Amino acid sequence: MKKHRRKVSEPLPELSEKAKEQLAEAELRKLRQQFRKMVDSRKSSNFRNQRMIASQYKEIENLKAEQAETTLLLSLVKSPKNLDLNQKNFTELRFLLQTKGDYEALISSMKVLLGELDDKIVQMERKITNQRQIFLKTQEANNPRKLQKQIHILETRLNLVTVHFDTMLTSNAQLRKDIEDLLFEKAAYDHVYQQLQRRLQTQKKTMNVAIEQSTQAYEQRVEAMARMAAMKDRQQKDISQYNLEIRELERLYDHENKLKSFLLVKLNDRTEFEDQAKKQEAVKIKKHGKKRKGESFESYEVAHLRLLKLAENGDLNQLTEDFLAKEEKNFARFTYVTELNNDMETMHKRTQRIQDDIINLRSQQQSSHEGTRNILKQMEEKLRKTTEDTDIYENRYREMSKTLEYLKNSVEKLFKKINCNATEILGKLGETGKITDSNLQQYFAIIEKKTNDLLLLESFRRLQEAEGPDVDVPQPFVNPFWGGSALLKPPEPLRVVPPVFGADSFSDKVEEVPHRALSWVQWNTLWTTVASGSWSWRTTFRRNEEKNHRRHCWRRGTR
């Protein structure tokens, strides 16, 4: 009967189970489709959010960079160093304006003195023509004794004039050397200036490369931070989902444990009941050995009755099927829990690996930032030193160029005032009539020749005045270019340097000649010595020396 009942009752649960499986599969497909759609929508929303966050980060960083630049510019403009520099420039400009007024007054006085000298030269030329006529008339009537005396006087005066002429030549030679030194120093400073310009360009190129590298590193850092944020969000979501699943599984596991404990209690009750039945059967077997078959059947009936009591509707097949289904569900849940545990372990490993990568990236980023900062500091220090050197050399170059320009202008004015002839210089190829570095020595040679001619004319005039009819004792020779004979010194053995009428090549002597700068005081001394007497020489020298001393003290204090 049991076999027949099982055969009859088996097809109905198979159909219901298949229908359930089909319904479950259909619902599972729907859920998978919904899950895929939700995953795709979440991915697209995450991608859009990441792009939006990255763009916002870039805009924030750009605004921060602009704010830093503006604050830096404001701090530089309002820094006490720049304010002190402006004050120093103002004081220097005021001092230069004051010196400009002094020099303009000196130039006006020199112009007046040169005009007076021109008038005197014209008068002297007229007197010389008159004296020549008188000399031709009175030459035959001169006494030989007086001639001897005059010859002796003129020889002494000529000796004194030659001494002064030699000193003039030595001073001119020294000035030529100073001019050559200035030209050589100018060439050397030009060479150094070009080298510093090249170094400055290379430093700027290296700075641009370093800035590009730093920007690339910063962009990589921003990308890594965005990835880290996305991974953290994903990790938080996975952890929350995992916690929910774990809670659900724990709830199911507790329910299954309760069910198993209930089944075990039921089975224990059944085993106790079976033990009692076995004992009774053993007693019955001992007593009644012949009735074993009937008793075994009775025991089966007792077990069957107990199972019917355990079953709800009295269906033993349903009870066994429920028990097997529960066991299968428990086994499936157990396998699902093990898979979840494995997934959790893999997720923990992945999160640990990601955290290690994040730590490594942070350490690499920090080391790269420190390296770029050190490189930028070194480059800034080198740039500061090079800019200081370039400023120093530029200031020196400006001073030397101002000195040379002032010297050229003064030589040109003196050349025009004493009516020198520049046909020898203009006859050369490439000359335009302007004073340059190459033809400056030629102009000096022509000026020196003209001064020698003027000195000879003055000596001849003195000779004619000394030969007057009523003059017994001649007046002492007074040189208009030296202020009087009171400053004359006894003759000393000096080496006479003849004037140079050509331009010397100095391109091969840049390293041999020591570099000395012709100061403003030396040029003013030379100007006043040639143009006026001893009183102007002394006062101008003292005044310019004091100004130069004050200027040097002020520059040292500012530097």
From Swiss-Prot:
Q: Top-down, what is the taxonomic lineage of the species of origin? A: Eukaryota, Metazoa, Chordata, Craniata, Vertebrata
Q: Would the keyword tRNA-binding be found if you checked this record's keyword annotation?
A: no
Keywords, alphabetical: Coiled coil, Differentiation, Spermatogenesis
Could you list the residue ranges forming a coiled coil in this record? 14-70, 185-261, 364-414
User: Could you tell me what this protein does?
Assistant: Plays a role in spermiogenesis. Involved in the elongation of flagella and the formation of sperm heads.
Tell whether Coiled coil is among the UniProt keywords.
yes
What cellular-component terms does GO give this entry? axoneme
Gene Ontology biological process terms, A to Z = cilium movement; outer dynein arm assembly; spermatid development
Q: State a single Pfam family of this protein.
A: ODAD1_CC
Its name, as the record gives it, is Coiled-coil domain-containing protein 63
Give the organism the record lists: Rattus norvegicus
InterPro entries noted in UniProt? ODA-DC/CCD, ODAD1_CC
